[in-house]
Design a protein with these regions (language model features):
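Active-site loop-to-helix "anion-binding N-cap" substructures in soluble metabolic enzymes
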Residues: 1-229
Length: 229
């Protein structure tokens, strides 16, 4: 039985003081919550303080990071290694977010390397996949997502997929725009992704993978989206 996961990507919001205040507030609001995992992904500058706050309070909230560089160390100015994140107690790492693909120009091979590096450091990548509005309107949404999955997971085994992977479907046209895919749209892609995983890695492995939806999720639509199987 998959445990639902709710992950919050804070993007470039909150300095380290504001992040600590927010995670303390969240921790209080989530007291007694059962049957779901919650992860927060603050900016890099706040990771250490948020990690310490979660540890000191014994919070069940799991720490996540927004990105990573696929090397253990070296002359990579401005980058953060998987080992550094693991040392802070990070559990989940977002890789391939559409904003990094679109704004920074990250390609599938780099996303694949990041996902592998996160896995090998004992953390779980949240692999982001999704299509543009143009691709959806041209009927290419499925082929786009399939290409991203194949590029990122070509070297993975069924055991690795079943224990070390989360996939986030994030239609690019719905991110930060106020537009949201309908629950039926999200479920259609969810079904395709799980079917692709089953064909590639076997039904048992596919059934263990948690598939998230991201894209203008709000309190008034979260329930409908979470209700999709």
């Amino acid at each position: 039985m998959r445990t639902p996961l709710v992950a919050g990507n804070w993007k470039m919001h909150k300095d380290h003081r504001e992040a600590v205040e927010l995670v303390r507030e969240l921790d209080g609001l989530l007291a007694g919550l059962e049957g779901v995992e919650v992860s927060v992904c603050p900016p890099f500058t706040a990771l250490s303080d948020v990690a310490r706050t979660l540890e000191d309070s014994g919070s069940p909230i799991l720490l996540g990071a927004q990105d990573v560089y696929p090397a253990p160390e070296g002359a990579f100015t401005g980058e953060i290694s998987p080992r550094m994140l693991r040392a802070l107690g990070v559990r989940y790492v977002i890789v391939g977010h559409s904003e990094r693909r679109e704004i920074i120009g990250e390609k599938d091979d780099l996303v694949a390397a990041k996902a592998r590096a996160v896995l090998e450091e004992g953390m779980v990548p949240i692999l982001c996949v999704g299509e543009t509005l143009e691709e959806r309107e041209e009927g290419k949404a499925v082929s786009k997502v399939q290409g991203q999955l194949e590029a990122a997971l070509s070297a993975w085994t069924g055991d690795e997929v079943s224990t070390g992977l989360v996939i986030a479907y994030e239609p690019i046209w719905a991110i930060g725009t106020g537009r949201t895919a309908t629950p039926e749209d999200a479920q259609e892609m969810n079904s395709f992704i799980r079917g692709w995983l089953a064909e590639r890695f076997g039904q048992d492995a596919a059934s263990e993978v948690r598939i998230l939806y991201g894209g203008s999720v709000k309190p008034d639509n979260a329930g409908e989206l979470m209700a999709m199987p």
